[in-house]
Amino acid sequence: MPLNLLKTYNSLLELDSFSESERNISLGRIFHRDFIETDNFFRNKAVKPTPQEGKTTIEILFHHLTTHSEGKYHHRVYDRDRSMRIHWIKFHLQEKKADTIEVFSVKDKQAVRTYIYNEKESYIVVLEPKTPQYYYLITAFYIKGRNRYKIEKKRNRKLEGIY
């Protein structure tokens, strides 16, 4: 399990041989290192977990970054592709390979969202600017299926600046 802590971008975490409990411990260690032990920033703005009334924001963020919504009632289930790339989020927030990512903002139905899009790796980090000082980390995921077309539509509607 500790070997996953040594993984860097763009390697994938090794999770398939773990039981659910072992997998959660391994992912939890990486999450703790990347989101609890250190503060995150994107372009000099703090990146915070999205609050949800009555719940611990860090636990919600961990659950959201390792699961996806499924079915009519949007029940969340383990997402192997998201989980194997959880350590990619910090790398993208830091824009370590700026030449491989595109950053753009789009006005969606609810709010303006800022996207950090890595087309080569089919990966995206979604932020919501809340104030001039910070963003909420909405989600991050491996893009597959119809999501690729959704992202392309968003790119075509991108705003002039980055919010």
Predicted regions and their residues:
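Ribonuclease/tRNase effector modules and their secretory precursors
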Residues: 1-163
